[in-house]
């Protein structure tokens, strides 16, 4: 049980996410950029390795190896936590006035999307998580690089400091827009490709429970409108 709590803390999953917004906002932006991708990538790699090792030691022919993990309905529990993580991250992100806090809650929401494929533990779900992590790394680091540049030039990190960015610095404004659209998951960006692989793995599993979770999940609104 403690291992699962540690995993949740590592990837900023609800209800172990409370440290994320304050750490993101209080740390230097360069450090925040590192924290936004490195722990999450390491956390998901560790989770996949952990459960894969457990399942490889299960007796052959076991219909549902998850049942042997503390006799708890882990697929359903992880799916519920995934839905809670997606919902809270997306809804709270659009209420922030600080770009760094917005990206913090965006990071929480993205963890929820990747958690959606964890209970499946199929080849396609693992590939989907790895693909999503790779796309997320480039999208998130790009957004933070823009924040670092604006901080150096203007001296602020709030949304007010980004007002009129398209007129003042067209190239920077276009770059930030592209990264935000990608984080939202709109086609034809890399964010859409990452979410496509995750959703495809869920649909391929054919479980009514996970398909219901997929269709009722909130829209990925990771940028403030």
Mark where each language-model region is:
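C-terminal ends of transmembrane helices
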Residues: 13-22, 87-100
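Alpha-helical multi-pass transmembrane bundles of energy-transducing inner-membrane proteins
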Residues: 3-4, 33, 92-158
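Structural signature of hydrophobic alpha-helical transmembrane segments
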Residues: 3-6, 70-83, 133-137
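Hydrophobic alpha-helical transmembrane segments in multi-pass integral membrane proteins
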Residues: 42-53, 115-123, 180-188
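Conserved small/polar residues in nucleotide/adenosyl-binding loops
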Residues: 1-5, 215-220
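Interfacial and helix-entry/exit segments of alpha-helical transmembrane bundles
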Residues: 3-4, 15, 19-37, 104-106, ...
């Amino acid at each position: 049980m403690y291992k699962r709590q540690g995993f949740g803390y590592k990837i900023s999953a609800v209800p172990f996410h409370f440290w994320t917004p304050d750490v993101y906002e209080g740390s230097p932006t360069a450090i925040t950029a590192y924290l936004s991708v490195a722990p999450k990538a390491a956390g998901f790699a560790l989770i996949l390795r952990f459960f894969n090792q457990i399942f490889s030691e299960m007796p052959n022919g076991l219909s549902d190896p998850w049942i042997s993990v503390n006799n708890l309905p882990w697929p359903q529990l992880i799916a519920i936590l995934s839905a809670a993580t997606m919902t809270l991250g997306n809804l709270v992100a659009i209420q922030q006035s600080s770009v760094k806090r917005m990206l913090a809650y965006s990071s929480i929401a993205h963890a929820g999307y990747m958690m959606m494929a964890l209970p499946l533990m199929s080849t396609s779900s693992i590939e989907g998580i790895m693909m999503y992590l790779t796309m997320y790394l480039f999208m998130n680091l790009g957004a933070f690089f823009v924040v670092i540049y604006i901080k150096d030039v203007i001296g602020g990190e709030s949304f007010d400091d980004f007002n009129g960015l398209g007129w003042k610095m067209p190239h920077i404004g276009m770059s930030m827009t592209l990264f935000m659209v990608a984080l939202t998951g709109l086609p034809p960006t890399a964010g859409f490709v990452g979410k496509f692989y995750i959703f495809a793995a869920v649909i391929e599993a054919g479980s009514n429970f996970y398909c219901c979770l997929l269709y009722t999940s909130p829209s990925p609104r990771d940028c403030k409108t």
